Amino acid sequence: LDELLSSEELRTRTFDGVEYIYLPDLLSAEEDIAARLGQLSTFPTEAPPTLDADIRVLEMAQGFAYAPLQRQAIRLALSSRVMVLTGGPGTGKTTTVNAILSLYEALYDRVALCAPTGRAAKRLSELTNHAASTIHRLLEVDYSSGSVRFIHNEKNLLKYDVIILDEMSMVDVKLFQALLAAARYHCRIIMVGDADQLPLSLIHISEPTRPRLIS
């Protein structure tokens, strides 16, 4: 291990007093993710002035009232560029996402729902009654390149105003980096998942992305 660290085949970073060991390319990807999320979160945004009234309209249409934490999440989603919504099964994530989606669709023409796998995307579509795709399909794989490249990237950005990403704990670091690279500079990113699920890869998000809700 010492030899790998001294040759920089492995690298370390310390967060909150804990030292982590990285492969260089994954460390670079995580730092790029943190920087991109930080840039997105600094773009000015304000919640619609009618937001509370709009939430009440949704409640009346559905015949139930949102829990205080759900209302907080909805307000946060409509007033932030970057948000993390996390909770275990039965905590109301789907109901909250549906409310957020309804409000976003009233404001924007281009809202995308995606997930890391086809099964997760199908489930997301069923729960929201809204078209959802895998991240790969959203970015569109360029099969002519001979390697894993995407048609949508920094030079050919996605046209969406909002991207809601489900099953976030299962998203590969490099894939998430590619998604952020293809997002427009003022895009809203909502990351949804279960904090208690085993993550596929560790993503450290720095201070600029602090708008989040954890239940």
Predicted regions and their residues:
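Conserved ATP-binding/catalytic motifs of P-loop helicase motor domains
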Residues: 1-206, 210
